[in-house]
A protein has these predicted regions:
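Short, small-residue-biased leader/transition segments that mark boundaries at the very start
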Residues: 2-7
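A short helix->loop->beta-strand "cap" motif at the edges of active sites that frequently abuts
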Residues: 9, 69-72, 101-102
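Active-site phosphate-binding strand-loop segment of PLP-dependent enzymes
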Residues: 16-88
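Conserved core segment of the aminotransferase class I/II
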Residues: 97-174, 182-183, 263-264
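PLP-dependent enzyme catalytic core of the Aspartate aminotransferase-like
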Residues: 100, 210, 219-228, 234-269
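Short hydrophobic/aromatic beta-strand micro-patches
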Residues: 125, 203-205, 245-247
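Conserved glycine-rich beta-strand-loop-beta hairpin in the small C-terminal domain of fold type I
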Residues: 149, 156, 171-181, 193-206, ...
Length: 269
């Protein structure tokens, strides 16, 4: 939304459908939004944040075909791509088909996986030459095309020498998500964790507790010291959700889960 504000763009959202504890793409709604003659760009989150979906090749192909049909470019935000559960691999949007490749602008960065926020290590991959020139022109116009030397070396080191550490991290985060899901199920009535196979962020359904997650997050923060993200900032049905970061040592996680329980159990509904 920050980018749309800067460039005076109107955002047309195609909300995911929440079904049986997980999110799915509403392709009928997506096509309605894409066929709007004013729609020129689709921003895809792959894997999806905050829901943690790892989109399948078939789902991505269908998105690509629809976007191509209506002349829409797809920016695929793949910043969480390495952070999938063990045994789960994400599918790069541009790899799915020649159609997807032709209309794709893929954004990646070691920022999330290797904790490099602020180093300016983002990269953009644009296979199509004409589209690449447009992107090149835009990032130079905005003067964001010149990373510092430290950022370049840091990104190369992360992508070429970080595999062993990354595999350990993925296993650790997966364990933390399992611990979180079990703790909530056993100790916090009325709260459930959305099925997720990517990211270190848990999306908690608190719809049985409140329809104002901002108020609930503020209450928990004030009364327990636990900082959570209110779901309303993510649009859609976010008013019924909280986002919890579990990329931390297990001792910190357990402390946070106890605070979460105490905050929710004492919350005045």
């Amino acid at each position: 939304s920050a980018a749309s504000d800067v460039y005076k763009r109107q955002v047309l959202q195609s909300q995911l459908a929440y079904e049986n504890g997980r999110y799915v793409i509403d392709f009928e709604d997506l096509e309605v939004k894409l066929k709007n003659p004013q729609t020129t760009l689709l921003i895809l989150c792959n894997p999806q944040n905050p829901g943690g979906n790892v989109w399948s090749k078939e789902e991505l192909a269908r998105i690509g075909e629809l976007a191509y049909k209506y002349g829409v470019v797809v920016i695929s935000d793949e910043i969480h791509c390495e952070l999938t559960d063990p045994g789960i691999d994400y599918v790069p949007f541009a790899s799915v088909s020649e159609v997807c490749k032709k209309i794709s602008v893929t954004c990646i960065a070691p920022t999330k996986t290797f904790n490099m926020a602020g180093l300016q290590t983002a990269a953009i991959c644009v296979p199509d030459e004409r589209l690449r020139h447009k992107v090149w022109r835009a990032i130079n116009t905005d003067e964001v095309a010149e990373p510092n030397v430290f950022a370049v070396d840091a990104a190369i080191a992360a992508f070429t020498k970080g595999e062993e550490w990354l595999e350990q991290l993925r296993a650790y985060i997966y364990e933390n998500k399992q611990i979180t899901e079990k703790f909530i199920k056993d100790n916090i009535p009325g709260v459930s964790m959305v099925e997720s196979h990517a990211t270190y962020l848990c999306w908690l359904d608190v719809s049985d507790i409140t329809d104002n997650s901002t108020r609930l997050a503020a209450y928990i923060r004030k009364n327990t010291g636990l900082f959570l993200s209110a779901g309303e900032g993510f649009g859609g049905d976010g008013k019924h959700f909280l986002r919890l970061n579990v990329a931390c040592p297990k001792t910190t996680l357990m402390d946070g889960l106890e605070r979460l329980r105490n905050g929710i159990l004492s919350f005045d509904r």
